[in-house]
Amino acid sequence: MLATVQRVSGAQVLIEDKIYSEIGSGLLIFVCIEKEDSIKSITAMVTKIINFRMLDGPKGSTAYSLKDTNEDALVISQFTLAAITGKGNKPSFHKSAKPEEAKLLYDEFMSLFETAYCNVKQGKFGAFM
């Protein structure tokens, strides 16, 4: 499983020019399910993200995690994180899981995340956002 985690002052997901979900200050999290991923790997990623000390603490230090704050999280599925770009001009996505398998694990990832942390929203799996 791959994830890109970014601090944001706010973020929103638009689908067909309508706001689907949005958050205030917190973390924007892009996740990619790969072929070899399992419940074990997604559970580990949820734990890691919730405990990342990326949020502002005293004097601007990054001392706090999501679980230490009341900030928001927005999770977006992004299969292109698995792109292999080493050869040629066309990326290969052979490391990413097939959509049906990825959807099952993504749903489990979201379930685990929502159980561990309540201030989480998400994009729509497979949608053009």
Regions found by a protein language model. Give the residues of each.
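N-terminal, polar/charged subdomain of small-to-medium soluble alpha/beta proteins
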Residues: 1-92, 104-128
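C-terminal helical cap/extension that packs against the catalytic core
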Residues: 97-105
